Amino acid sequence: TLFPYTTLFRSPAGNNKIWNALRLVKGWTVADLPQPESAGIAVKWFEARVAAAIEELNDDFSKYRISEALMVVYKLFRDEFSSWYLEMVKPAYGQPIDATSYAATLRFFEQLTLLLHPFMPFITEEVWQALVERRPSKSIMITQMPDVGNKHDRLVADFENVKNIVAAVRSIRLERNIPNREPLTLQIVSGDYDDAYNTVITKMCHLEQIVRAPKDETSASFLVGTTEYAVPLGSTIDVAGEVKKMQEEIDYLEGFLASVMKKLGNEKFVAHAKPEVVANERKKQADAESKLKTLRENVEKLKGRDADVR
């Protein structure tokens, strides 16, 4: 198929995703309130994310890579805007949204309709017209496409870590049937952590607090990069399940490390590859070894705890 993602956007589900996002945003009550810190961070992140996507789109269009361009804008709307950004700025149930975040959200939505327009001309015209009041002579067809704007590669990269942390905490809730109304504590056990994103993580994970602390035996732990995190669970932890999950990750990392070591053990590769490529492989080796060390220690601790209980 030439345009594999076209059917996704033309399907009822694809159209519904856009209409549902519009209904959500237009259904908010707007008030003159201070912008929450988490929403301010979300706006800066999505601005940087849109800039990176537009740069990628421009490159794809210049090289006639239409399928790739469609994939970029599809993922930007579905994964980043609908699944992450809107949830980060969404006000609490029954509460208004601050005017600053709302204006930014309308601006982003308008940019997205412009980027989608070449692939979905009719629905994007309707949505674009519905976002704000416009003169009858205005049309998305004669509106200039958005420029790249302010790029911030570091912020975009940092947010991948944020999303991985949020996804891990949500998985812990799901696996143990812990309702969202029950606040959790997130512990930073070891490694680097930037507390600039605390408010976003706290909101998205429904946390009571984020602290630097050693994990106890009742904690469910996970790794993002080489940083270890833990969520204390009291007596609800399933030791056998945790050990099994960690062992599966150990097995995967051992295989991954073996493939990296094989590559680094190839003298021709080390001699002829670019220095930055070799350095990247060595970083993969170091990261995998660090993760394996942490996981093996955690498995032993959990097995020891289980033996003590018995």
Model regions and ranges:
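Short, small-residue-biased leader/transition segments that mark boundaries at the very start
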Residues: 1-8
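Feature 926 captures the class I aminoacyl-tRNA synthetase adenylation module centered on the KMSKS loop
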Residues: 9-310
